[in-house]
Amino acid sequence: MSSLKKILGLKGKGKKSKKLGIAPPPYEEDTSMEYAPSAPIDKSYFGVDEMDTHDPNQLRYEKSFFTVKMTVRSNRPFRTYSDVAAAVSHWDHMYIGMAGKRPFYKILAFLGSSNLKATPAVLADQGQPEYHAHCEGRAYLPHRMGKTPPMLNVPEHFRRPFNIGLYKGTIELTMTIYDDESLEAAPMIWDHFNSSKFSDFREKALMFGLIVEEEASGAWVLDSVRHSKWASLASSF
């Protein structure tokens, strides 16, 4: 049994989640690959039903409670929001977490980055620049990603390094998002952004792997999400 555990990379002494009874994913471990479907799923396979296929033109609305806490430490002060976005967009490099929540986490990371505020220099650790953001609330997201799986109230933590041009440092993110089944109205997720930080919303969203389109009404809709190597794209801004 011990040999089998070694092969599978299991550890018997890992702490278990009190709520789910399973060991939490190793969010900070390095891995040589990300998990993603390599081909379309055949409808005849087990568990595949109509929720796995969708009309890309069908508009859906996802209403949720969310919380995002972000800390960014850098070796030097950021000059523009483009510098911030280039760094923070690395948060899900080599992502290991709940796959169904990743598109929503991308939005929360984008949201948090627009609300970052610098810590007074006298309070910064060893004099290095620090930035913090804490956003929470209720919101709905218009999207064309098809039917999404149920989302539970389980926080996830991510810590990643970044090295973009002149900037080096770390990003720490704690995010929670779960279904809001109430009948109360909620604002769009985009209303929680600090839009004064930038004007080119579509371009900045793309740095986080978010493909958004503007409707005739002026509202933004999430069309799709990309999980490719956004580091090279982000570093070009």
Swiss-Prot record:
Gene Ontology BP annotations: symbiont-mediated suppression of host mRNA export from nucleus; symbiont-mediated suppression of host transcription initiation from RNA polymerase II promoter; viral budding via host ESCRT complex
Biotechnology: VSV is used as an oncolytic agent for cancer therapy, because of his wide host range, rapid replication and mild pathogenicity in humans. VSV used are mutated at M51R in their matrix protein. These mutated viruses cannot successfully infect normal cells, being unable to counteract the antiviral state induced by interferon-alpha in normal cells. Cancer cells are impeded with responsiveness to interferon, and then can be successfully infected and lysed by the virus.
Top-rank taxon: Viruses
Subcellular location: Virion; Host endomembrane system; Host nucleus membrane; Host nucleus
Region feature (Disordered): 1-23
Compositional bias segments (type: Low complexity): 1-10
GO cellular component: host cell cytoplasm; host cell nuclear membrane; membrane; viral envelope
Renumbered ranges of motif dynamin binding: 2-4
Transmembrane segments: none
Residue positions of motif PPXY motif: 24-27
Entry's Gene Ontology molecular function annotations: structural constituent of virion
Motif (PTAP/PSAP motif): 37-40
Record note on modification: Phosphorylated by host.
Primary localization class, coarse: virion
Pfam families: Vesiculo_matrix
Membrane protein topology class: Peripheral membrane protein
UniProtKB keywords: Apoptosis, Eukaryotic host gene expression shutoff by virus, Host cytoplasm, Host gene expression shutoff by virus, Host membrane, Host mRNA suppression by virus, Host nucleus, Host-virus interaction, Inhibition of host mRNA nuclear export by virus, Membrane, Phosphoprotein, Viral budding, Viral budding via the host ESCRT complexes, Viral matrix protein, Viral release from host cell, Virion
Xref: InterPro entries: Vesiculo_matrix, VSV_matrix_sf
Subunit: Homomultimer. Interacts with viral nucleocapsid; this interaction contributes to the virion assembly. Interacts with the viral envelope glycoprotein; this interaction contributes to the virion assembly. Interacts with host RAE1-NUP98 complex. Interacts with host NEDD4 and TSG101. Interacts with host dynamin. Interacts with host NDUFAF4; the interaction inhibits viral propagation and is independent of interferon activation. Interacts with host GTF2H5; the interaction may inhibit host transcription.
Family statement: Belongs to the vesiculoviruses matrix protein family.
Biological role stated in the UniProt entry: Forms a double layer around the helical nucleocapsid, the inner matrix layer binding to the N helix and the outer matrix layer binding to the envelope glycoprotein. Plays a major role in assembly and budding of virion, by recruiting cellular partners of the ESCRT complexes that play a key role in releasing the budding particle from the host membrane. Condensates the ribonucleocapsid core during virus assembly.
Domains: entry comment: Late-budding domains (L domains) are short sequence motifs essential for viral particle budding. They recruit proteins of the host ESCRT machinery (Endosomal Sorting Complex Required for Transport) or ESCRT-associated proteins. M contains two overlapping L domains: a PPXY motif which interacts with the WW domain 3 of NEDD4 and a PTAP/PSAP motif, which interacts with the UEV domain of TSG101.
Protein name: Matrix protein
Native species: Vesicular stomatitis Indiana virus (strain Glasgow) (VSIV)
